[in-house]
Structures are given as structure tokens and as C-alpha cells.
Amino acid sequence: RTAAETAILEELPPVSALILAGYMRIIGPTLLRAFPKKIINLHPALLPSFPGRQGIQDAFDYGVKVTGVTVHFVDAGIDTGEIIAQVPVNITDGMSLVELEQAIHRQEHQIFPATVKNLIQEGAI
């Protein structure tokens, strides 16, 4: 992982933050040191519930009535960084997993760019 992250740093143009969506890898210490509290991730569940790769599936299987989308800073854990923004998504009776995935993705497409824009305007990233 260190070699891969070093290669990423060598290839990146000068940037002030990393914005991740669908990056299904654990961020290691090389990138965390290079971008302290400047790596933003999108997660398809209301953290701290249902961390990891299968957030939508896990929420659906557990039977919760509300799940959602989280934008958070990346830290050394798996989906454990400081939460920046969240939006709920109701799971209605009879909703299929595909319908839930679509509802989650609709919310992701709204909250993620808006949150990143706010962070930039606030000078946080």
C-alpha cells in the first residue's frame, strides 16, 4: 500500500485535498500524512452504522427504516473519520434493494458536491 500511495503522490499535480467517491481501498499512512484532515469520503449509510463496503446491503438486510448518506473526513480507521454531513433516506415497506440503491445514489449526487463546495468556500480544504 505504501508503494501505491507514494506513486499516487508522485503523479498528482499540486492539490490541497483528496475527494473520494467509490474509492474502495483503505487509505494508508502515506496519504493520511500528506493530506491531514483533507481527505473527504462519501459513504452510502448513516455512519457510524454500517461501515465498510456493503453499507447499503447491510442496512437493507438489517431491516432499518432509515439509512442514508454520509460525507466524512478519512482517518486511519474504516469509515470512522469525523462526520461532515449526512442526509437520511427512508426505507419504505416493500422497497427493493435496487430501489434503495437508487434512492441512496440520488442523495449522494446532491450532498457530495454541495458539501465539497461548502468546505472549499469555508477554506477547510
Predicted features along the sequence, with ranges:
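One-carbon transfer enzymes
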Residues: 1-125
